[in-house]
Amino acid sequence: LLSFNAGANDVLRPNYNPAKTLEEYRQAVKVLSGTGATLLLFTAIENVDGTGKVAEMWRERFSEYNENVRACAKSCGAILAEAKRAPFLSDKRFLHTDRLHLNAEGHRRFAQGVLEVLELPHDESWDIPLPPADRKPFFQEKSENAKWIISFVIPWIWRRLRGRSSGDGRSAKHSEPVKW
């Protein structure tokens, strides 16, 4: 089994080139499927509590990206782990503080969904949504948004202006495999 998840960060970039990114993804899947391994491909979450033009643009981009992943999976007989099978993951409480990636519980639950797709033992309650969240007080929400802008948005813009990638100089979160 060979799992492959790539290209989603490219979708977020201001200079995103769908033709290039989607073709590179297709070529990578073609090479990987040539290994004889069973491929496991992943779609991305399309809708995370966002409104406005940027949120709509990302939804459209991720929809197109996901259609490409589905077509690739179909063409090579890959197993597909569909993020849309877990709509509860669009709940912000499953996101890391960067608001882009899943947090530990989001990853744990999605991993259980992957085990289900693979027809392996898994936690049957992996896809149960959290109870509705209490509305945060106005100033708490604004404070959290300001912290997010200072901690993630401004550094991202600064890296982009200097031609650096967000992955430059970063190491893995876990140096050893993590067992759930």
What do these predicted ranges mean?
Residues 20-34, 64-71:
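Alpha-helical scaffolding segments of alpha/beta enzyme cores, especially the outer helices
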Residues 1-24, 46-47, 153:
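Oxyanion-hole/transition-state-stabilizing segment in secreted/luminal serine hydrolases
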Residues 2-5, 40-42, 80:
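Ligand-binding pocket scaffold of soluble enzyme catalytic domains
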Residues 11-13, 48-56, 90:
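Short, solvent-exposed loop/turn segments at secondary-structure junctions
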Residues 16-24, 56-64, 98-106:
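Alpha-helix N-cap and loop-to-helix initiation/capping positions
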Residues 33-38, 78:
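A short helix->loop->beta-strand "cap" motif at the edges of active sites that frequently abuts
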Residues 49-83, 104:
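Substrate-gating cap/lid alpha-helix
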Residues 75, 98-99, 105-180:
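Conserved catalytic region of serine esterases and O-acyltransferases that act on ester linkages
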